[in-house]
């Protein structure tokens, strides 16, 4: 009996002495595991963020049908960018892409960008150079995007130089045609009379939708136009070939097109920030800065909120995917399981130069992650 009591005392003594040591070790081990888990999660998110940025660059070029980023310098952009009302309004009203995903709707966009507005600058034409033995303005080449979309508006914008006294200006837009037997090379498109006051020059728009539609139906008839804006003394006030101090005052065409709207569906998901300890699949903030890429060819936005998905898709949380859970139970080693991916994405509007130095305002689908989920 005394031997049994002695064994019990020894056992209790060992529990008292050794117990706290074991608890401290377990606590330290648990803390180390938690720190290691958080560190791994941060590293994983950083890698995911970097991959997302590279993927965005590739997607933008692909969706805009560009093999490489247009090589346009800042100086060239200052010269090409029209100082005209429609473009200034787009830029002035532009803001960083808003993170507005509260409606929970998902657009089933086509892969390629949906163009809304195309601003086309004039280019040189051999035919124009031959008329009267001197250069004429203007010849416009049209993007294939205009060919395959419905044109709802087409405006020719011209800039008139300032006058010193109140002046009546006669504006005439002529369409070039193949020389006729009587030598005629022009046919009238529009004529209008303007009263100009002294001061700064003005921008004037002229509706050319019908002419554009005819050009699209018969591309061979597009030989260019000539612009005249004569004052009472016969001086031409239209800026067709900008001189010193007239950068950004070239004539240009503003063409608006529309596409069929897409249907929508609903979805939900978790939102986290960079300091979150959430391990499950979650949406994290990510701002893409185009200036950091050196992409000066993107006029607006200069940056936008793209967001990205990161986190685990543990099978214990997968009541939403019973078929995947059953597959995992049947073959746990052979099933990779669902991944944390975007389940809701929305487009961004973008104003940019394409490879032909045309200014395009369009909608690029699926560029903002609004919701993340396991799929």
UniProtKB/Swiss-Prot annotation:
InterPro entries: Cystine-knot_cytokine, TGF-b_C, TGF-b_propeptide, TGF-beta-rel, TGFb_CS
SUPFAM superfamilies for the chain: Cystine-knot cytokines (SSF57501)
Cellular compartments annotated: Secreted
Assembly mode: Homodimer; disulfide-linked. Interacts with WFIKKN2, leading to inhibit its activity. Interacts with FSTL3.
Annotated signal peptide: 1-23
Protein's organism: Macaca mulatta (Rhesus macaque)
Gene: MSTN
One annotated GO biological process: negative regulation of myoblast proliferation
Family to which the UniProt record says this protein belongs: Belongs to the TGF-beta family.
Name this polypeptide is given: Growth/differentiation factor 8
